[in-house]
Amino acid sequence: MAKEEIKIIAQNKKAYHDYFIEETYEAGIVLSGTEVKSIRMGKVNLKDSFARVENNEVYLYNMHISPYEKGNIFNKDPLRTRKLLLNRHEINKLIGYVTRKGYTLIPTKLYLKRGLVKVELAVARGKKLYDKREDIARRDAKSELEKHFKEKQLGI
């Protein structure tokens, strides 16, 4: 079978810095026509967005989709709440995670899959400051090792 083509439109890189990602889910999203056109043009921001479960439905908050230039009266509010489309089983699992202390739902990616806009929703646990410092130290040590190894190979 042919591999499904996925075009990533937006990523929330800050989420990987601020949270431990436990599990990810793929969700559809309810949008209007002008929002889809704006997303296809890449005018979307996931930076401060989060999801919440209300009345056994999942909603996405603070995802900024810039108004479509040619949308006129059909443009919606850029920061409006958007409903996510998940199976009942997945929603029940998310409810179980979110009721535990310290867990939250964060969108990590927004992409097109077979012409449909999808959101990768992550169950995340917040990092403490020392966890962030530890990650930075680990990354620096790795780059230092690679630099040292490269110098050794070149004979410097």
From Swiss-Prot:
It is found in: Cytoplasm. InterPro entries: SmpB (IPR023620), SsrA-bd_prot (IPR000037), SsrA-bd_prot_CS (IPR020081). GO terms for cellular component: cytosol. The keyword Transmembrane helix does not apply. This is SsrA-binding protein. One of its GO terms (molecular function) is RNA binding. CDD domains: SmpB. Coiled coil: none annotated. The keyword Cytoplasm applies. GO terms for biological process: trans-translation. It comes from the Bacteria. Required for rescue of stalled ribosomes mediated by trans-translation. Binds to transfer-messenger RNA (tmRNA), required for stable association of tmRNA with ribosomes. tmRNA and SmpB together mimic tRNA shape, replacing the anticodon stem-loop with SmpB. tmRNA is encoded by the ssrA gene; the 2 termini fold to resemble tRNA(Ala) and it encodes a 'tag peptide', a short internal open reading frame. During trans-translation Ala-aminoacylated tmRNA acts like a tRNA, entering the A-site of stalled ribosomes, displacing the stalled mRNA. PANTHER family: SSRA-BINDING PROTEIN (PTHR30308:SF2), TMRNA-BINDING COMPONENT OF TRANS-TRANSLATION TAGGING COMPLEX (PTHR30308). The lineage of its organism: Bacteria, Bacillati, Bacillota, Clostridia, Thermoanaerobacterales.
